[in-house]
């Protein structure tokens, strides 16, 4: 059995190194071999230039493909894995196209493992644990109101004037600002077309409590069922969102204003220009520590009184083992690979 790890970007290295150093049969595929060698300096491993046809030739039944490539590659690689009776792992959200491969994977007797990084990933574990604990409390009745919050973000450990730094291309962050979101607020669906219209303050209950800015991200509603909320629960609030440093909204106000005006091909071109400029001005320096904050919170109330409330939280930062983001994304991926092995 071989592990074909595709992609050696900044979020991939700690987990990849762990698999190699633990003695697993790992083959690395990267679009630029020299970059992969530099990232894995001092580690003995076979590295090939990424090409899906070359990967297909070397892929054998029971092998595992790990995709740490851009999202467009996940489904093609998962399809390749199924066709060769191999397994597939990624840290990314399950797209509708990936979901449609479920029955084919079952028929082939292989695993497709996704959403196994930080967010999505570790946040799911925290959410399921909270829901299970609330159910076991036996405090719930028909009048209980439930509020769920899950906020995650990567920020610079030492805040800068821009209130953010980039560890890879800013284009994904900029495009996400053009994405709508759905959540529940005050018992009703809350739909937002522009994230900056829903930015609020959040007091994170860390060991040293700290105020951040948060906003809803993507479509939160399918996770009500995924986290196995009781169908009879009255859901007052349910939101999965992004966390940023206090002052981020003000620092990015002019960016929000410009993004609102961008459309079509000219808009895409301008986004790329902005991305390149932000990368020059606000990329992490070598060995500069980042910081990751994750808070998952579940609260139950009856007659305006809190009867149950718990928060799972994580506050991590980069060190000699790698950035916090890289460790928290790639280590869970490596654990999933080990589970399949």
Regions found by a protein language model. Name each.
Residues 92-114:
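Rossmann-fold NAD(P)-binding glycine/threonine-rich loop
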Residues 3-8:
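Conserved N-terminal Rossmann-fold NAD(P)-binding element of oxidoreductases
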Residues 133-341:
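C-terminal catalytic/substrate-binding lobe primarily of soluble NAD(P)-dependent oxidoreductases
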Residues 12-13:
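N-terminal Rossmann-fold NAD(P) dinucleotide-binding loop
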């Amino acid at each position: 059995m071989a592990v074909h790890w595709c992609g050696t970007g900044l979020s991939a290295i700690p987990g990849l190194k762990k698999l190699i150093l633990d003695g697993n049969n790992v083959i690395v595929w990267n679009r630029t071999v020299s970059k992969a060698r530099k990232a894995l300096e001092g580690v003995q491993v076979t590295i090939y230039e990424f090409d899906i046809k070359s990967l297909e030739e070397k892929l054998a039944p029971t092998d595992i493909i790990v995709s740490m490539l851009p999202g467009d590659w996940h489904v093609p690689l998962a399809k390749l894995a199924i066709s060769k009776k191999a397994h597939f792992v990624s840290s990314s959200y399950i797209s509708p196209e990936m979901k449609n491969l479920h029955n084919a994977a079952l028929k082939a007797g292989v695993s497709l493992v996704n959403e196994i990084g930080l967010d999505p990933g570790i946040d799911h574990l925290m959410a399921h644990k909270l829901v299970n604990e609330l159910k076991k409390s036996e405090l719930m009745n028909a009048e209980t109101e439930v509020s769920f919050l899950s906020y995650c973000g990567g920020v610079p450990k030492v805040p800068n004037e821009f209130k953010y730094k980039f560890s890879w291309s800013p284009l994904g962050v900029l495009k996400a600002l053009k994405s709508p979101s759905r959540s529940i607020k005050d018992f009703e669906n809350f739909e937002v077309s522009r994230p900056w219209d829903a930015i609020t303050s959040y007091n994170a209950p860390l060991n040293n409590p700290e105020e951040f800015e948060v906003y809803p991200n993507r479509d939160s509603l399918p996770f009500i069922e995924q986290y196995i909320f009781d169908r009879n629960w009255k859901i007052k609030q349910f939101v999965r969102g992004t966390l940023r440093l206090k002052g981020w909204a003000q620092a990015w106000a002019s960016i929000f204003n410009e993004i609102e005006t961008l459309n079509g091909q000219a808009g895409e071109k301008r986004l790329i220009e902005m991305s390149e400029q932000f990368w020059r001005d606000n990329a992490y320096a070598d060995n500069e520590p980042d910081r990751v904050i994750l808070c998952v919170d579940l609260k139950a109330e009856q007659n305006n009184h809190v009867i149950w409330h718990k928060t799972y939280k994580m506050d991590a930062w980069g060190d000699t083992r790698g950035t916090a983001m890289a460790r928290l994304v790639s280590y869970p991926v490596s654990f999933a690979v080990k589970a399949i092995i």
